[in-house]
Amino acid sequence: MITGSIVALATPMKASGEIDWEALRRLVGFHLDNGTDAIVAAGTTGEPTTMSFAEHFDVIRCVVEEVAGRIPVIAGTGANATSEAVELARYAREVGADLCLSVAPYYNKPTQEGLYQHFKAVAEGGGLPVILYNVPGRTCSDIYNETVFRLAELENIVGLKDATGNLERAEELVDRLKGSDFALYSGDDPTACDFMLMGGHGDISVCANVAPRAMHELCEAAVAGDDERAHQINTRLMPLHTALGVEANPIPVKWALHRMGLAEQGIRLPMTWLSDKYHSTVSEALQLAGVTEG
């Protein structure tokens, strides 16, 4: 089971919108040097929904090659067509990803039975261990806890990224799945500390893009049950957690990476560059977190 800080990796792009492969490799190295425990390639923060299939595949392959087995790579393989999600998972397996992260099908709003059958098909046909990804604020499709419990009984479904931010739901998940090998990850940085302290196994984090060492230390403390140290680190990071949500992800974090000199000013429509009025908010949060100097 993977534990700790799992970065939801942004995909660096040039001003033209072209993927910046050299910057992507450097960004992977930045995480290897700063304690990140695992990397999600081409998850939501990586903008796969505005990539071609070939680009999506190439991002996963590039990250796998650069990591070279040093930490686990989780491939973002979600799609709202089950056959496409299976195909993406198969490709991720072929290039050496360790697991896949499969988001609830978006826009078409399946029933709970439809969600169950979708993920069952991905688990059986994709050939990789599957982490479910529940983010109803983006997908309009909510994987209910009871459906998670059903899916957790399937052999190749190994975890859940819960990005609801609902700690009551998280508590039920932890209580029901305690003692199993099923991993529970937060996908909501502002509530991740409490999620882990109640028994979660890690955080699939946007903030880790820019504060990897601090997020590693936070997750390490929280997973170990060190309440005092975890809250101490989290208090310092909370302004950054908040600032990275002032506009839709990954808009603020891509601006932050540019501010840090780790990426060019590149993002793809329909996402746009961070509004001027939020530049100072994100910049000040980076300083408070100790990521940049004033």
Swiss-Prot record:
It comes from Chromohalobacter salexigens (strain ATCC BAA-138 / DSM 3043 / CIP 106854 / NCIMB 13768 / 1H11). One of its GO terms (molecular function) is 4-hydroxy-tetrahydrodipicolinate synthase activity. It is found in: Cytoplasm. Gene3D superfamilies: Aldolase class I. Catalyzes the condensation of (S)-aspartate-beta-semialdehyde [(S)-ASA] and pyruvate to 4-hydroxy-tetrahydrodipicolinate (HTPA). Belongs to the DapA family. Pathway: Amino-acid biosynthesis; L-lysine biosynthesis via DAP pathway; (S)-tetrahydrodipicolinate from L-aspartate: step 3/4. SUPFAM superfamilies: Aldolase (SSF51569). Pyruvate binds at T45, I204. Keywords: Amino-acid biosynthesis, Cytoplasm, Diaminopimelate biosynthesis, Lyase, Lysine biosynthesis, Schiff base. SMART domains: DHDPS. It catalyses: L-aspartate 4-semialdehyde + pyruvate = (2S,4S)-4-hydroxy-2,3,4,5-tetrahydrodipicolinate + H2O + H(+). One of its GO terms (biological process) is lysine biosynthetic process via diaminopimelate. GO terms for cellular component: cytosol. It is an enzyme of class 4 (lyase). The keyword rRNA-binding does not apply. Homotetramer; dimer of dimers. The record marks T44, Y107 as: Part of a proton relay during catalysis. Pfam families: DHDPS. This is 4-hydroxy-tetrahydrodipicolinate synthase. The keyword Lyase applies. Its EC number is 4.3.3.7. The active site is at Y133 (proton donor/acceptor), K161 (schiff-base intermediate with substrate).
